[in-house]
Each structure stands twice: as structure tokens, then as C-alpha cells.
Amino acid sequence: KFLSARNSALNNAYMTGQFLSSHDEDGFKASLINGKGYTEDEATSAALVAATLQLTAKGIPVIYYGEEVGLSGLNNYPYQTNRYDMDFSKATKDNVTYQHYKNLLSIRNAYTDVFARGSRTVVAGSDEEGYDVVSRSYGGTTLYVGMNIKDTAKEVKVPVSLAAGTEVKDLYSGATYTVGSDKTVAVTIPAAKDGGTVILTEVKKTKDPGKTDPTPEKVSATLITLDKKTAGKQQNDTKKAAPKSGDDNEAATYVCLLGLAMVAITAATYRKKRACN
């Protein structure tokens, strides 16, 4: 409820940034490990889902450097382990956190208006089972964002405003689903350690490039036939209408003189106005 109310309150008069970590407070993962007794793996899993919530919410997502590769530290003066040197060697294909951020940022970039301006409505969820699904809608486009904080995958039914039989795609994993007769989509939200995220969108149907419209072909054939019948006549007409070289020179001279006359008239008018002033 809080996030839905926040979403409704934010508009283009606000410059609101949401962040999980900063230079003067404990990092998100570090705070879970040191304050709540999470293991490193548990904190990493929670951070993945938190990043999904952050990057799919209205507002400006602020990523504290290193967060995207799994770095975190404490605001423990004078050591300040939250102000670490950036470790670029962690930005690899094998780094789950890094790939998670790349995937989410790519999706947010593709649907900027939906995430920056869209409405937010909770459509499914369970505190006990640890998952939540919200719809983000703007300009005729609706995305369904599912998040799972548990260490096991969740099979859930997501109510959608789409017709039965419509194909939907999970932008996060690439998996496709079909809307059931009850206008729900049965999806699997992965465990938190695997990203804990699904982002569903309708698959728009496009025209089969292998099929052609017969009407344009028929029209083209008719035009070609007409062109063959009248080709000789058109050639003769063109020859008759073609001007002689002398006519070309006269026409060019006339256009040139007309242009000079217009310039002279404009200049005279300008001088007259200045004289009157």
C-alpha cells in the first residue's frame, strides 16, 4: 500500500531518487549480515530482489558504486568499509548480481515511460509465501512485475487484463506463457538466489512476412499493362513537347531576370521604409 501511494504521489515536479546504499550509511548487504544475521548468500539473494523493487519503481534509481557487482560495506568510521575501491574484475558473466543488474537496466531502458510514469497496482501476492506481483501501466502498455524473496521458486497465477489465449513473455528470463480461460497466467517466479524476478508483457502479433497482399500485385500488373499500351504515344508526346536549346536559354534568362527584379523591389522597399522612419 505504501509503495502504491508513493507511486501515485510522485509526478514530474519531483526529483526523487531511491537507493539501497550510500557513502554515509551501511550498505544494504552489509546491514543484513551485521544487523540481521544473514549469511553472505542470504544477503546476496535479498539484494537481488531489492534491486528489482528499486529498478522497477517510479523515481530515479541510484546505484551506489560496486553494488552492481555485489560489493557492500559498513559506515564504520574511521575504517569506512563502505567506501571501498571499485573492483572491476567482478563484472563478469559468472557474477549473478552483475548479470541481474544488466538485465533489469536493459528492461527499464526499453520501457522507460512505463516505469517512470506508469500506475502501480498490486494484482497478486502473499506475505506468508513471500511473493508479490504488481502491474505497471502507461500509454496502453502494461507490465506485470513479480518478486519472490523465498529460497524456492513459486508457482503463481497472475490475473491479467488480456484475452484468453494471448501469449505473454517474461522479459527477465525469455520464457513465454499463454493466458488461460480464467484470464490468468500461470508463471514460475524463480527463487531469490536466482533473481526472484519475472516481468511479463504481451507478445504483440506481427504480420507474417511470408504472406503478401494480392491487391497491390494486381494493381501493379494493371499499371504495367497500361504502360505498355501507351508507351509509344508517351514517347511521341515527349518528343513534341521537348523544348529546343534556344527555348531553354530563353527560359533560364527569364527566371534569372525575374529573380533580380524581386531582389531590386525588396531592396527599394527596405530603403523607403528606412527613409520614412
Predicted regions, residues:
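Conserved alpha/beta catalytic core and glycan-binding cleft of carbohydrate-active enzymes
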Residues: K1-Y77, S119, D127, N148-I149
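Aromatic- and carboxylate-lined catalytic core of secreted/periplasmic carbohydrate-active enzymes
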Residues: D85-D127
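Carbohydrate-binding surface patches
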Residues: V123-L162, T201
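C-terminal beta-strand-rich structural cap/linker in extracellular carbohydrate-active enzymes
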Residues: T141-L143, G180-P216, I224
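Solvent-exposed beta-hairpin/edge-strand motifs
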Residues: V160-G174
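C-terminal low-complexity, Ser/Thr- and acidic/Pro-rich disordered "stalk" regions positioned immediately N-terminal
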Residues: K207-D248
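Juxtamembrane/start-of-transmembrane alpha-helix segments at the extracytoplasmic/lumenal side
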Residues: S245-L257
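C-terminal membrane-anchoring or membrane-association module
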Residues: M262-N277
